[in-house]
Design a protein with these regions (language model features):
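Intrinsic disorder at enzyme termini
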Residues: 2-28
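N-terminal capping segment at the start of a domain
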Residues: 39-47
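Glycine-rich flavin
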Residues: 58-66, 71-169
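A short glycine-rich beta-alpha junction/loop motif
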Residues: 64, 212-224
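DPxDG-like acidic metal-binding loop motif
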Residues: 159-199, 204, 214
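Residue-level detector of conserved catalytic or cofactor/ligand-binding positions
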Residues: 225-234
Length: 234
């Protein structure tokens, strides 16, 4: 995909994302924790399915969207609950009692709305204008990715491990080492925000007890992306 346009990407949300926009602004700590507790029986009933599928079941993903658990740290300006980091610990502890993989995905994917808030406004809009419920995976193994500056942005390539929740996600934040020249030493770290059409998911995750995290590798060949699709480490 070398030479691909760095213009704003038009994308279609996954079928599992809610069609209607819902605001969770004003939902407080206690209410969000109670929402997690009410989901425990359903998640417990699907725990074996989650491990068998090696990803979140669609029904579980929909339940988590409806409850707002993926949006606990999303900025309030786009309808997120905008709660502090303590809610991650308590919500995930409740869910982990019955399905550690689901708990892992909640904490992991919910934190990426917070991370997206550090990208330029036009990049936030590229995702949240289409769906405020968008799911974003990550792999923060910076040495796994390589990048260099090109006109208008960066050229990025690599193979990244442990991209939890990648099958349920439409986007991915992938770490890379920035080099001034192809064979030069790293000079900085960056995140690249890529749509799932821009990388390959490699089906190699079979960890006993945490198969449902779906922490597969992802890879892309030389890919040019716009400057607004990259940022320094949060």
């Amino acid at each position: 995909m070398k030479g691909q346009s760095t213009a704003r990407l038009e994308w279609t949300p996954s079928a599992t994302l809610p069609k209607a926009r819902t605001s969770f602004a004003g939902v407080g700590y206690d209410e969000m924790l109670e929402r997690a507790r009410r989901l425990v029986p359903k998640i417990a009933a699907r725990a074996e399915e989650c491990e068998r599928l090696r990803r979140l079941p669609d029904e579980t993903e929909r339940d988590l969207h409806e409850a707002g658990l993926f949006r606990i740290a999303q900025p309030a300006r786009v309808g997120g609950a905008d709660l502090d980091v303590g809610i991650f610990v308590d919500v995930c502890a409740e869910i982990a009692r019955v399905c550690p993989s689901t708990a892992w995905n909640i904490g992991n994917l919910a934190s990426h709305h917070w991370m997206l808030g550090y990208f330029p406004p036009e990049t936030q809009d590229e995702l949240w204008d289409v769906s405020t419920d968008v799911l974003i995976a990550t792999s923060l193994a910076f040495p796994a990715g390589r990048g260099r500056k090109v006109e208008g942005g960066y050229e990025v390539s690599g193979r990244w491990p442990l991209s939890s929740g990648v099958d349920n996600s439409d986007w991915n934040m992938l770490g890379f080492m920035l080099r001034e020249h192809e064979d030069g030493p790293p000079v900085d770290h960056r995140f690249a925000l890529l749509h799932r059409s821009q990388y390959e998911i490699i089906d190699n995750w079979h960890a006993v007890g945490l198969c449902g995290t779906g922490s597969k590798d992802v890879a892309t060949k030389a890919m040019e992306i716009g400057r607004a699709s990259c940022r320094e480490r949060v």
